[in-house]
C-alpha cells in the first residue's frame, strides 16, 4: 500500500458553523451500492484527497512576508487578491468535501461524525490561523509603519542634530570670522596708514627737493644778477669812456671850429686886403683915368670888383652852409647819444633798486658832469649842454 500525503482541508467559518446536511445519493448509486456493497473504510483510515491542497505554512509565509516600500492601497489590493484566491481555493475544497461527504455518508455515521469533527476542528484551526495571520499582518504593518515613523523621526532628529551642529559650528565660526575680519580690517587700515605716511614722506621729500631747487634757482638768479651788475658796471665804465671820448671829440670839434673861425678871419683879412688892393687899384685907375681915358678904366675896375665880390660871397656862403650842416649833424648825433646814455643809466639803477637788497651805486648825470668838470683842464669852464648848443648855433651867425 503506497503512502499518501494527508493534507488538512480548511473550511470557512460559515461552513463549519452550519449543520451538516445528509445528502441522499442518487438512485443509481444506491442500487449499485446495494448490489455491490463497498467496503467501508476503517475508522482510523484517512481519505486521500485527489486535488492538491496548498500547504497552510506556505500560505502563511506568503501572507507573513513584510511588504516594505509598497503603499497601503497596493497592500490592500494584494490582501483582497489573496482573500479571493483563498475563497476560490476554499470553494474548490468545499466541492471536493461535498463529494467526499457524499461518498463517506454511505459509510458509518460515526466515522462521518468524527470526520466532521475533524473538519470542524480543522476549520476552527484554519480560522484561528487566518485570524492569527491577519493579526500578524496587522501587527507587521503596524510595526513597519512604526518602524518607518521611527526611521523618519530618527532621520529628522539626525537632520535636526546635524543642522544644530552646523548652526553651532557656524556660530562658533562667526566670532572667528569676525576676529579674522577685524584683523584683516586692522591690517588693511595699518597698511593704508603706512601708505599714507609713505606718501606724506614722499610729498615732504618732493617739497624739500622743490625748496632746494628754488634755493638753487635763487642762488643762480643772484649770481646772474651779480654778473649783470658787473656787466652794467663794465658797461657804465665803457659809457664813461665813450663820454670822455665824445668830450675829446667835441673839444677837437671846438678846436676845428676855432681853426675854421681863424680861417674865416684870415679870409676876411684877405678880403679886406683885397678891398684895400682894389681901393689902391681904383686909386691907380683914377690916376690912370686922369692920364688916360677915365671911362674905360672905370668899367674894367667895376667889372673886376663885382667879380671878386661875387666870388668871395659864393665862397663864404658855401663855407657857412657846410659848417651849419656839420654842426647840425654833430649836434643831432650828440643829442641822440646823450639821450640813449641817460636812458641806459636810469634803467639799470631802477632795476637794481627792485632786484638787489644792496643797490649798486650808479653815477647820476650830475655826478657825470662833476666828473667831466673835474677832468676839464684848469682855466676852462664847462658850460651846460643847452648853452653849448646855443653858442654853437649862434657862433657862425655872429661871424657872418
From Swiss-Prot:
Q: Where is the composition biased (Low complexity)?
A: 78-159, 169-186, 279-292, 346-358
What is stated as this protein's family in its record?
Answer: Belongs to the involucrin family.
Q: Which organism is this entry from? A: Tupaia glis
Which PROSITE patterns would you find in this protein's record?
INVOLUCRIN
Explain the post-translational modification: Substrate of transglutaminase. Specific glutamines or lysines are cross-linked to keratins, desmoplakin and to inter involucrin molecules.
Q: In which tissues is it expressed?
A: Keratinocytes of epidermis and other stratified squamous epithelia.
A Pfam family per the record: Involucrin2
Name this polypeptide is given: Involucrin
Amino acid at each position: 500500500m503506497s503512502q499518501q500525503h494527508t493534507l488538512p482541508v480548511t473550511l470557512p467559518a460559515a461552513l463549519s458553523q452550519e449543520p451538516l446536511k445528509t445528502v441522499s445519493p442518487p438512485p443509481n448509486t444506491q442500487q449499485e451500492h446495494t448490489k455491490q456493497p463497498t467496503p467501508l473504510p476503517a475508522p482510523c483510515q484517512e481519505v486521500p484527497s485527489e486535488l492538491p491542497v496548498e500547504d497552510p505554512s506556505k500560505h502563511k509565509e506568503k501572507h507573513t512576508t513584510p511588504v516594505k516600500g509598497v503603499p497601503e492601497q497596493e497592500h490592500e489590493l494584494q490582501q483582497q487578491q489573496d482573500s479571493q484566491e483563498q475563497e476560490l481555493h476554499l470553494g474548490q475544497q468545499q466541492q471536493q468535501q461535498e463529494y467526499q461527504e457524499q461518498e463517506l455518508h454511505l459509510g458509518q455515521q460515526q466515522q462521518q461524525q468524527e470526520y466532521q469533527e475533524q473538519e470542524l476542528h480543522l476549520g476552527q484551526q484554519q480560522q484561528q490561523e487566518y485570524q492569527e495571520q491577519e493579526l500578524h499582518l496587522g501587527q507587521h504593518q503596524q510595526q513597519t509603519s512604526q518602524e518607518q515613523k521611527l526611521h523618519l523621526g530618527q532621520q529628522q532628529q539626525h537632520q535636526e542634530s546635524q543642522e544644530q551642529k552646523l548652526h553651532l559650528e557656524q556660530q562658533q565660526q562667526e566670532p572667528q570670522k569676525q576676529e579674522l575680519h577685524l584683523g584683516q580690517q586692522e591690517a588693511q587700515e595699518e597698511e593704508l596708514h603706512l601708505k599714507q605716511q609713505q606718501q606724506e614722506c614722499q610729498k615732504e621729500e618732493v617739497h624739500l627737493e622743490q625748496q632746494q631747487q628754488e634755493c638753487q634757482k635763487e642762488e643762480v638768479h643772484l649770481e646772474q644778477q651779480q654778473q649783470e651788475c658787473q656787466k652794467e658796471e663794465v658797461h657804465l665804465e665803457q659809457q664813461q669812456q665813450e663820454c670822455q671820448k665824445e668830450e675829446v671829440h667835441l673839444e677837437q670839434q671846438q678846436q676845428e671850429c676855432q681853426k675854421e673861425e681863424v680861417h674865416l678871419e684870415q679870409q676876411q683879412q684877405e678880403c679886406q686886403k683885397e678891398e684895400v688892393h682894389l681901393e689902391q687899384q681904383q686909386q691907380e685907375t683914377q690916376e690912370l683915368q686922369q692920364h688916360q681915358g677915365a671911362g674905360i678904366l672905370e668899367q674894367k675896375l667895376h667889372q673886376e670888383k663885382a667879380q671878386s665880390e661875387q666870388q668871395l660871397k659864393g665862397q663864404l656862403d658855401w663855407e657857412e652852409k657846410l659848417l651849419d650842416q656839420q654842426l647840425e649833424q654833430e649836434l643831432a648825433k650828440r643829442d641822440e647819444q646823450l639821450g640813449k646814455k641817460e636812458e641806459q643809466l636810469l634803467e639799470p639803477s631802477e632795476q637794481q633798486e627792485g632786484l638787489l637788497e644792496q643797490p649798486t651805486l650808479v653815477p647820476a648825470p650830475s655826478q657825470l658832469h662833476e666828473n667831466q668838470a673835474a677832468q676839464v683842464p684848469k682855466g676852462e669852464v664847462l658850460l651846460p649842454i643847452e648853452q653849448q648848443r646855443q653858442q654853437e648855433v649862434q657862433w657862425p651867425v655872429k661871424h657872418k
